[in-house]
Amino acid sequence: MIRGRLLCVFVAAGCLMSCGASQETTSSGTSSVVLVGLEKTPCHGRCPVYSLRVHGDGKATLDVGRFCDEAFGRSLSQGRHTAQVDVGVWGLVADEAHAMGFDTLAQRYDDPRVVDLPSATLTIDGHSVMNRYGGPNLNELYTRIERLVGRMNWQATPEDSR
């Protein structure tokens, strides 16, 4: 009876320890956690619409919507684009965000009574902050990310492989 209880305790402890250690990995075994991500949603005007994800393994995806030319400083066709990036450069962006106290921010800044405002959801090392109304001014960080996006070598993804 005692052995059975001990076995249950060890199995439960093992399960609990493995829960905190789960992390997405690619087939090569490297982390695919989102190091830096930024998603901007539409408004009724000319707000840029896109979704960027830079993973810890250097793979990046960019889903380009409308009105992105000015934000990126170049023209990219609408649709999905991929790139292999220098993780060190994007790590500096993450470091800058951490230095600003990004990981202490609330997950959501919004007021549903306010209409026609785009939102920006910034993800740094897996922590996401949706900022639509009443949140901190993260515009300098958004601009830095958009400038980096504009300098990257993006490859358009064929529609059938999306």
Give residue ranges: language-model regions.
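Sec-dependent bacterial lipoprotein signal peptides
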Residues: 1-17
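A short, structured loop/turn motif at beta-sheet edges
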Residues: 54-58, 84-92, 124-129
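Hydrophobic/aromatic beta-strand elements that line small-molecule binding cavities or substrate pockets
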Residues: 50-54, 80-83, 120
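Short, flexible N-terminal segments of the mature chain
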Residues: 50-69
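Short, well-ordered, aromatic-rich surface patches in folded extracellular/luminal domains
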Residues: 3, 19-44, 50, 94-162
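A short-motif feature that recognizes glycine-rich, charge-decorated loops
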Residues: 63-104
